[in-house]
Amino acid sequence: MTDTVHEQDSGATAGQAPSADEGLPSTGEESPSADEELSSAERNRRTRERRIAVHRTARRVLNRPGHLHTVRERLALLDDVQDLFDLDGPVDMYGNGVVEALEERTAGLLGLEAAVFFPTGTMAQQVALRCWAGRTGDPVVALHGLSHPEVHERNAFSRVSGLRPVRLTSEPRPPTAAEVRDFEEPFGTLMLELPLRDAGYVLPTWEELTEVVAAARERDAVVHFDGARLWETTTHFGRPLEEIAGLADSVYVSYYKSLGGFGGAALAGPRTLVEEARAWRHRYGGNLFQQFPTALSALAGLERALPRLPEQVAHARVVAAALREGFAAAGVPWVGVLPEVPHTHEFRVWLPYDAEVLGEASLRQGEETGVLLFSGPWDPAGPGISVAEVGVGVAGLEWTADDVRAAVAAFVAALEG
């Protein structure tokens, strides 16, 4: 499924079926014309504009992600930030000032020695793994086949940073300790994405995570966490952030995923690694002149959004159960909610209908009732099967289980209408 703030590789995304004619001999039919391709692009553009309009006018939604807001609404995130940082002090230049304050706050929350701000997570992780490769003498990075660098970053590890990713597994679950311990070739770094978004925001149990880390240590490998959404994991693991982050040698976190900031990321770990990463950040073009709007929005997210995430995770479990009950009561042949009990405040829903049909029903429900049950796109996941992501944000905390079941009934009515 397409996340509007992520770059996508060409080809099918995780969880989607390949094109129906992929790998088959030509039927002799002509390829779509440029006009048809343009028409398809125009259709997609109009659908997106319609989705944004419905989202903005809906009186009730489960989540209000930042990329669907107006500029004015996003600027409101900086209201009252004077309580978080002295706005009468000097503005930041090349990473000092408010950026340094954000780095210190992040390192403290994660219980790690230091942190360095990056404009993107893609850059942060390339720098982290490049630094570890230099220290271990091994450019091989063991990771999951559905991890973000493999699916969404256009092979940047190998093309830009000289790293060689190897896949422990591509199954829609976290890698196991046995897969790490018994992998057939050496690797210098193990990268774990927590949660694994393209497998459905899944997490291992705490015991499984510690066993996987121990298996990597047995191989003398460094452990790096792709923790873009690590902020969401404390409820599932039953551990504080600093204990979770403390399992790894380095951790990347995002300031817009989960926290709703304007953008940005941080790499946290030993002070010597962080200082080396600053040099590489400059070489990669990431040492921007001023970052105060983004840094202030990140501080606001840490102060306001982070404390509410456990409540959202708990309520996502209520919403997921009510969705299953609602679709069963409406007579839908089957529904998949994965994970069955969400590990974070985000999960996936699978239904036995074409994506275009489900997308149209979602929009029509929002337009006609003011209630938007599925605010994101539906994507094909096989013949006659589609999948959508559901996130329970602060707005979703207002929904009761009865509200969800009623919205499902209205959605199915729109589907059949």
Residue ranges and their predicted role:
Residues 46-120, 131-134, 144-151, 156-158, ...:
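Conserved N-terminal alpha-helix of the aminotransferase class I/II PLP-enzyme fold
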Residues 1-89, 93, 351, 355, ...:
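N-terminal glycine-rich, Lys/His-bearing helix-loop that initiates the first secondary-structure elements
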Residues 133-188:
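PLP-dependent aminotransferase-like
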Residues 115-122, 254-255, 290:
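Active-site nucleophile and cofactor-binding loops and adjacent substrate-binding regions
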